[in-house]
Design a protein with these regions (language model features):
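Conserved phosphate/anionic-ligand binding catalytic regions in large, soluble enzymes, centered on
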Residues: 56-74, 116-123
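Long alpha-helical, hydrophobic tracts
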Residues: 52, 82-85, 114, 118, ...
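Generic N-terminal targeting/processing segments that precede catalytic cores or assembly contacts
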Residues: 1-57, 80, 190, 197-237
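Acidic-glycine-rich active-site phosphate/pyrophosphate-binding loop
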Residues: 36-53, 88-107, 152-160
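Alpha-helical support elements that line or immediately flank enzyme active sites
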Residues: 72-84, 128-136
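N-terminal glycine-/lysine-enriched basic segments
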Residues: 78, 104, 108-117, 123-124, ...
Length: 237
């Protein structure tokens, strides 16, 4: 899912995305990247996964289809750059899954319930925690990274253009993987958070329930309600 669209670009079912990951991948080798290898590849693979999803390809919801690029995007990039074994990658995916379980058990990962902060936010927290374990971070550091992620994405709305999981979802996956890398870097450097992960998950859920329906996957607000978006989707007239 993270590699196929790079090799063979394909247009999404809704026609809103397609080919972005190929452009990013080629850009990495032009010597002009602002992000460097890890982040550049992370956003490339994250966006590619969303292209696969939007063109009816096979993906793993992690934790949702709309946020499915973030965990593999970061983990695959780290493996490629640092040479982690497949066994090590499998191991840290359990870590990511544990963070996702905590969110599903105590809050939500659905954009229709909690906004994009619940989808991309939790996926980003999962990726950050897994990245910490890859680099031998402690369990507490994993939670610091995940907590930082949720602070940074608190209040993010779910506003898919045309009710499709394409745009701005693909861009949000790039932002989510970037956020995960930032949070993991901070935690690895020894930066702590006095608001624990459990409380951040709770407050994310509280904020999500306070979002109006227009900003929770209904495509009635945010980016989806802009004139340009309505013109693209032909559903608002």
């Amino acid at each position: 899912a993270a590699f196929s669209p790079i090799k063979t670009p394909v247009k999404s079912m809704g026609g809103l995305i397609g080919g972005e990951s190929r452009k990013l991948y080629e850009f990495q080798f032009q010597g002009k990247s602002l992000c460097g290898n890890v982040l550049g590849l992370s956003i490339t693979y994250a966006m590619a996964t969303l292209e696969t999803n939007a063109s009816m390809g096979l993906i793993v919801a992690s934790p949702t289809a709309g946020s499915a690029g973030i965990v593999p995007g970061l983990i695959l990039a780290l493996q490629e750059v640092y040479g982690f074994s497949d066994e090590k990658i499998r191991q840290v995916l359990f870590n990511a899954g544990a963070i996702g379980y905590l969110a599903m058990r105590n809050a939500t990962v659905a954009g229709a319930v909690g906004g994009c902060q619940a989808e991309v936010g939790i996926a980003s927290a999962m990726a950050a925690s897994a990245a910490m374990e890859l680099f031998d971070g402690t369990p507490l550091q994993c939670t610091y990274a995940a907590s930082t992620v949720l602070m940074n994405m608190l209040g993010l709305v779910c506003d898919p253009v045309g009710s499709l999981v394409e745009y701005p979802c693909q861009n949000r996956n790039a932002a989510g993987v970037s956020n995960a890398l930032i949070a993991a870097e901070m935690a690895m450097a020894g930066i702590t958070q006095f608001i624990p992960l459990d409380e951040m998950i709770d407050t994310m859920y509280t904020v999500g329930r306070k979002l109006p329906a227009e900003l929770r996957e209904t495509a009635l607000g945010g980016c989806a309600a802009t004139p340009s978006a309505c013109e693209k989707c032909h559903l608002c007239s």
